[in-house]
Amino acid sequence: MKPFGMIPFFIPHVGCPYVCTFCNQSRITGQSGISHLTPDYIKETITDYVGSKRNDKFWEVAFYGGSFTAIHRDLQHTLLGPTYEMLQEGIIDGIRCSTRPDAVGDEAITLLQSYGVKTVELGVQSMNDQILVEAKRGHTAQQVKEAVSRLRKYEMTVGVQLLPGLKGETWQTIIETAVAVSELKPDFVRIYPVLVIENTELADQYRAGEYEPLSTEQAIRYCAFLKAWFERHNIEVIRTGLQSTKELDSGNSLVAGPYEPAMGELVVNEQYKQCIERCITAHIEYFVDKDLSQWNVREQLNTFTALNLSIFYPRSLTSKVRGLKNRNIVYFQEKYPHLNINWYEDSTRNTVCCCIDGLQYVL
């Protein structure tokens, strides 16, 4: 299968009937206004992206940053017209857009399909109604369910965008959202931990002490759980964390929050860390003391004869298993000082294996 070649056009906040507490699309995307999005500009941009690499990728135009199906019909025609021409000419392979769950009625979907749009990404953010109210989203979890169902009726590919870390978020609401979204069976999910952006209500709440953003480590844990959950339910997570932009990197727009350009890599690191730790915990509980209900596993380890732990992994997974800047190695050294831990790159295998005192656990 060819890799995706995304050609993004940002329409910051266009079509949005509400101003969410966290939203400042111009700051996030580094773009403002859409007057430059003329038919000629759209065609030229597509041509520049594709160039001589037409057959190298699956090229898809994406309209992001606003509620596409909520903008005026004339503007939808203006944006989709030249894009559809490029689709018919075989220069691109697909078109997608992002929108609100309460803006995908039958007429809206029919219009999209008339221009060859096959993928719609819904800005869901959370499936907890109280969090949606706090964020001033203007839609409910039930409307998300109805939107996905309606898009499915028209055989559209459906994506869901989530924002863990909104005001009122807890592990309980994270799990609630994970379960509810997996029941909808979207084709893919994007996970963007909440950032506090300048000139937003959330920034005002943060400065007033009314909102506490996620730490980077907590954001990583939330995202790792969500990613693992969706993957277990055969739902692809295509991105974790906002893409780096000059505006965000400059620090002029970012007030607070877990902005980390390597968030996707860190989340995968966390997934492997948790898998290894589960092996250790299960081994200790079964072979060392079958009733650890009154003991903390770490305390038990500190009083038990050292175990020998070897972790084997293929070269392709070295950085993912060991962690960015060896963060997983450091974590296990500090948390389990009484374990003899060794890390081995093994070119003969294609899986990760945790070996504890001769017993192998395949991750």
Residue ranges and their predicted role:
Residues K2-G5, Y211-L363:
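Auxiliary Fe-S-binding modules of radical SAM enzymes
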Residues Y18-C20, I197-A203, L248-S250:
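Short acidic/His/Gly/Ser-rich catalytic and metal-binding motifs that mark active-site loops
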Residues P12-C16, Y192-I197, Q243:
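Short glycine-enriched loops at secondary-structure junctions
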Residues M1-G30, K43, T47-T69, S98-R100, ...:
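N-terminal pre-triad scaffold of radical SAM enzymes
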Residues K53-F58, E89-I92, Q300-L307:
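Short helix-terminating capping/connector loops at secondary-structure junctions
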Residues I28-D40, E44, G65-I220:
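Conserved non-cysteine loop/helix-boundary elements of the Radical SAM core domain that shape
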Residues W59, D93, K118, D187, ...:
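Short acidic/polar active-site loop segments enriched in Thr and Asp
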Residues E44-S52, P82-M86, L111, R150, ...:
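A generic secondary-structure signal
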